[in-house]
């Protein structure tokens, strides 16, 4: 049985549990304990603090973990990245008081920077030849300049609203982060087989994101032009209709280009366009 370490609460917890649920892996969270076994898949979930997950996976206490890339890079544990999951996105940035003009990275020379991510910050400063003092604190990093604890901060930024409320401005994006599926490097062959099934399900869910299944009635004399517009997976499905001169076209569209393509299809005479969500896609 695979053991996967998951953040115990917060946005990463919610999005992780949603992914497992969409992969038809049932985990009860109504009476949550430290370790919960799935009722329909050979996996158990270990609920932890996010900063404990990299070490837990590297040492083999858990086989897998879902953790923010920022925590994984900060801890520098010997585990492998299996899959980028594309959610819980944020960035780690340097920020400074908004009323001070920012001339470039050289401004940080001799300054004190407050952060909960000293390893990532130290590596960045060293790479860029900046000599600054790192002040490590946990929580409420953004208040440090306002109370005189530091000149600047290095912290997670999502929307930037927390910076604004503390009269700070983001001046350097050091790294972009998202949720990662990480794994122990010494999993048994039996566990690797379970992992393959888990990845198969996760990939089906992730591939379907931002995709729509589209059905339309199309005039046969415009069929070649309509097919040329469609950026489907391989080629659309074409089915004859009872009405002479018409056929039904089924395809998959990327939501980012949906309205652009639909407009072209209507211009070519497509009618009765039906759009459906896709839960999973196996390619």
Curated annotation (Swiss-Prot):
Per the UniProt record, which EC number(s) apply here? 2.4.2.17
One GO biological process term = L-histidine biosynthetic process
Q: What is its main location?
A: cytoplasm
Instruction: Give the metabolic or biological pathway.
Output: Amino-acid biosynthesis; L-histidine biosynthesis; L-histidine from 5-phospho-alpha-D-ribose 1-diphosphate: step 1/9
Cofactor names:
Mg(2+)
Q: Coiled-coil segments, which residues? A: none
Q: Name one GO molecular function term.
A: ATP binding
One of the Pfam families matching this protein, by short name: HisG
List localization entries. Answer: Cytoplasm
Alphabetical keyword list? Amino-acid biosynthesis, ATP-binding, Cytoplasm, Glycosyltransferase, Histidine biosynthesis, Magnesium, Metal-binding, Nucleotide-binding, Transferase
* CDD domains assigned to the protein according to its UniProt record, in alphabetical order: PBP2_HisGL2
Q: Could you say how this protein's activity is regulated?
A: Feedback inhibited by histidine.
The protein's annotated catalytic reaction(s) are: 1-(5-phospho-beta-D-ribosyl)-ATP + diphosphate = 5-phospho-alpha-D-ribose 1-diphosphate + ATP
Give the signal peptide, or none: none
Briefly, what is this protein's role? Catalyzes the condensation of ATP and 5-phosphoribose 1-diphosphate to form N'-(5'-phosphoribosyl)-ATP (PR-ATP). Has a crucial role in the pathway because the rate of histidine biosynthesis seems to be controlled primarily by regulation of HisG enzymatic activity.
In the record, the note on similarity to other proteins reads: Belongs to the ATP phosphoribosyltransferase family. Long subfamily.
Mind telling me what this protein is named? ATP phosphoribosyltransferase
Q: Which source organism? A: Bacteroides thetaiotaomicron (strain ATCC 29148 / DSM 2079 / JCM 5827 / CCUG 10774 / NCTC 10582 / VPI-5482 / E50)
């Amino acid at each position: 049985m695979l053991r996967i370490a998951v953040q115990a609460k917060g946005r990463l917890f919610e999005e992780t549990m949603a992914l497992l649920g969409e992969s038809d892996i049932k985990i009860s969270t109504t009476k949550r304990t430290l370790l919960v076994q799935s009722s329909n898949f050979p996996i158990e979930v270990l609920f932890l603090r996010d900063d404990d997950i990299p070490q837990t996976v590297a040492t083999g206490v858990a086989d897998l973990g879902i953790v923010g890339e920022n925590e994984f890079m900060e801890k520098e544990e010997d585990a492998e990245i299996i899959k980028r999951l594309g959610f819980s996105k944020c960035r780690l940035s340097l920020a400074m008081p908004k009323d001070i003009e920012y001339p470039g990275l050289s401004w940080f020379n001799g300054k004190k920077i407050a952060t909960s991510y000293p390893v990532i910050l130290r590596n960045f400063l060293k790479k860029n030849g900046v000599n600054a003092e790192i002040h490590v604190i946990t929580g409420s990093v953004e208040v440090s300049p306002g109370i005189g604890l530091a000149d600047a901060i290095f912290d997670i930024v999502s929307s930037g609203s927390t910076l604004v409320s503390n009269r700070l401005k983001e001046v350097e994006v050091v790294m972009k982060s998202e949720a990662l599926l990480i794994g122990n490097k010494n999993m048994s062959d039996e566990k690797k087989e379970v992992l393959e099934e888990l990845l198969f399900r996760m990939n089906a869910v992730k591939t379907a994101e931002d995709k729509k299944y589209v059905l339309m009635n199309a005039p046969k004399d415009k069929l070649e032009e309509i097919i040329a517009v469609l950026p489907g997976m391989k080629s659309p499905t074409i089915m004859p209709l009872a009405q002479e001169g018409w056929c039904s076209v089924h395809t998959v569209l990327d939501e980012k280009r949906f309205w652009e393509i639909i407009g072209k299809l209507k211009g070519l005479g497509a009618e009765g366009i039906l759009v459906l969500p896709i839960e999973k896609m196996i390619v």
